[in-house]
Amino acid sequence: MYEFKDYYQNTVQLSFDDQPFSDSPKHVWVICRFGGKWLLTEHEDRGYEFPGGKVEPMECAEEAALREVKEETGARVKSLKYLGQYKVLGKEKVIVKNIYFADIEKLEKQADYFETKGPVLFHELPENLSRNKKFSFIMKDSVLPISLKKLKESGWIE
């Protein structure tokens, strides 16, 4: 297990075990690849980030992950794999979030991308991402680099 501080100095615990913090997490975050590129969305307030959000009532985390990717990017997921889970010990509440890796089959244009401006493709993620004001705070802690390392070790990405 990994432990570190997030952008707002909250303690974050990250594990690649099978749902170590909750078997019914209320949030999801989906690292997406499409045609050898990273698929992100541009949140209207936060900036660039991988798709994600809340698990709705009567919905499991996997269903939420598929829905959020579709809503925020218009993408159809070819395969979705559970990667890990993290817990943010916030000042007011605790958030548990599943991390998934999605291989995207295709992007479809939509009239509405909900609270985002739609899909954004990156050949490479910037090295100075933690200091880049165009990126969301969600992308600026250690969850992303540790998750990318795990994806490479697992052979899911090159």
From Swiss-Prot:
Cofactor: Mg(2+)
pH profile of the protein: Optimum pH is 8.5-9.
Motif Nudix box location, chain numbering: 53-74
Binding site for Mg(2+): 68, 72
Enzyme category, top tier: hydrolase
A GO molecular-function annotation: metal ion binding
Keyword Hydrolase in record: yes
Positions in coiled-coil regions: none
Organism: Bacillus subtilis (strain 168)
Null mutant phenotype: Growing cells lacking this gene have a 4-fold increased spontaneous mutation frequency (a mild mutator phenotype), as well as an increased sensitivity to DNA-damaging agents such as H(2)O(2) or t-BHP. These phenotypes are increased in a double ytkD/mutT disruption. They are also seen in stationary phase cells. Triple ytkD/mutM/mutY disrupted strains show increased mutation rates during exponential and stationary phase.
SUPFAM superfamilies in the cross-refs: Nudix (SSF55811)
Domain Nudix hydrolase: 6-145
Gene Ontology CC annotations of this record: cytoplasm
Catalytic reaction list: 8-oxo-dGTP + H2O = 8-oxo-dGMP + diphosphate + H(+)
Gene3D superfamilies attached to this UniProt entry: Nucleoside Triphosphate Pyrophosphohydrolase
Protein's UniProt name: Putative 8-oxo-dGTP diphosphatase YtkD
Enzyme Commission numbers on file: 3.6.1.55
Pfam families linked to this entry: NUDIX
Similarity comment: family membership: Belongs to the Nudix hydrolase family.
Role according to the record: Involved in the GO system responsible for removing an oxidatively damaged form of guanine (7,8-dihydro-8-oxoguanine, 8-oxo-dGTP) from DNA and the nucleotide pool. 8-oxo-dGTP is inserted opposite dA and dC residues of template DNA with almost equal efficiency thus leading to A.T to G.C transversions. Functions, in conjunction with MutT, to protect vegetatively growing cells from DNA-damaging agents such as H(2)O(2) or t-BHP (t-butylhydroperoxide). The 2 proteins do not however protect spores.
Keyword Hydrolase part of the UniProt annotation: yes
Record text on activity regulation: Not induced by oxidative damage (following treatment with paraquat or hydrogen peroxide). Not induced by mitomycin C. Not induced by sigma-B general stress inducers such as sodium chloride, ethanol or heat.
Additional comment: According to PubMed:14761999, can complement an E.coli mutT mutant. According to PubMed:15576788, cannot complement an E.coli mutT mutant.
Keyword terms of this UniProt record: Hydrolase, Magnesium, Metal-binding
